[in-house]
Amino acid sequence: MIGVTSKGILAIPYLEAFLHRPVVHANVHFGQLWSVGAAKASAFAGWGRRASGQRAKSIAARRGVAALMLEDGFVRSYGTAARAAPLSLVVDDVGIYYDSTTASALENLLASDQSLVPDEQGEALLADMVASKISKYNVGGQWDEPALRRPGKKVLVVDQTAGDLSVALGGGSPDT
């Protein structure tokens, strides 16, 4: 069982399927765990480096169990986050990938000797995603490939939601 430190996270459809375990609300007041069911949890989960993630980390450390940081997956939804349920979640038991101030499971994987070459199943999945034109929010129109192939300079605009923790924890600022 996983104790979840946010009612918003508990509202995510199929959360138990994403986490492969039952979930229960880890009701925390003044730093104390008040949930009878959560007292039996083998891990506590919160949202990245937000307050719920910090609560999960603190409770897990006191109880000697794993802390799981959750974040939108790289294929987020069909539509914007406010209007659509997630299609994937990142579950990290080390840190969270966008926080450059501490390690994450992704960082550890990249630094390991483990092969990162996709197997046949991974190659097939990637081919299906490309053929289906799957993107993070799946709301954009078709790419204008002929326009992209025209000679001349191109500008890539990279942006993030104002105030998103990935900017500050990734070493950036609103000016960069």
Positions of PLM-derived features:
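Catalytic-core helical/loop segments in enzymes performing group transfer/polymerization on anionic/lipid-linked
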Residues: 1-176
